[in-house]
Amino acid sequence: MTVSLPSHSVSRDAPDRLMLNRLPARAGIGLKPEHFRAILHNKPDIGFFEIHAENYLVAGGPFHQALTTIRQDYPLSIHGVGLSIGGENPLNQTHLQRVAALVERYQPAVFSEHLAWSTHNDLFLNDLLPLPYTDVTLTRVCEHIDQVQNALRRPILLENPSTYIEFSASTMSETDFISEVVRRTGCGLLLDVNNLYISGVNHNRCPRQMLLELPLHRVGEIHLAGYTESRDGANDLLLIDSHDSHVTGPVWDLYNKTLRKTGPIATLIEWDSNIPPLDVLLNEASHAQHYITESKKHATTTVSSTS
């Protein structure tokens, strides 16, 4: 059975937002095998865990054994990295069905993917590559998202990318492109605040202004991560989305401004390289939780002052 989802206009009222916010408005962390033992033994007070779908596409093994137990105690988010939603080629149906089976097995609160491409013909590239923002690309991305949502029988969240180059062929901005994808497909937005900051700095744009141009009423989850500073060929500052360090001060500041606009949203700390001890991730999550709690107070104060 497949479910037909809207291909054009979607409602922007409160029920849409509630449907996308199925994770608790708390901070979570990525579930790493290095931490399985500590999590199973200590059961830390954390809002949710997130996994990369492609790490769990086999039928069994120790990853599934640990996840099955952990899933009993925590909400789960599944994050895809290999569907190549922005690719020129048709979606790999075998891969899509394996992802759908994983979603059916664990019933995560949300499923998300990237606005990027990573395959071309039979070639798989171990990266998330940018795409031109054109009408042709827009149509293709929307068709791919419709296919994924039908296969998974649910709306997905689409993550804004971190980019290092732009295409002269683009006819619209990244924020306009994302807004139109959300409008046409009914998907939600996984707002990666780190990516937003990186792309703004790399392309000499104001990250805060970019934030205001996004469909914030459709945010179902937020990502935070660390970046690395580098230099391009012209010796200009280039930020790299490395996911291997603490969240930086400017990203925390942009995150705080985000929550003042959206209200409390489930927030993930991403740390995918140079994995630290679990306590380090829990401390980062605690910092995010502080901002979430403050945003709840701000929302309550705002409502009270307008009553």
Curated annotation (Swiss-Prot):
Belongs to the UPF0276 family. InterPro entries: MbnB/TglH/ChrH, Xyl_isomerase-like_sf. SUPFAM superfamilies: Xylose isomerase-like (SSF51658). NCBIfam families: PRK05409.1. It comes from the Bacteria. This is UPF0276 protein plu0081. Pfam families: MbnB_TglH_ChrH (PF05114). HAMAP family: UPF0276. It comes from Photorhabdus laumondii subsp. laumondii (strain DSM 15139 / CIP 105565 / TT01).
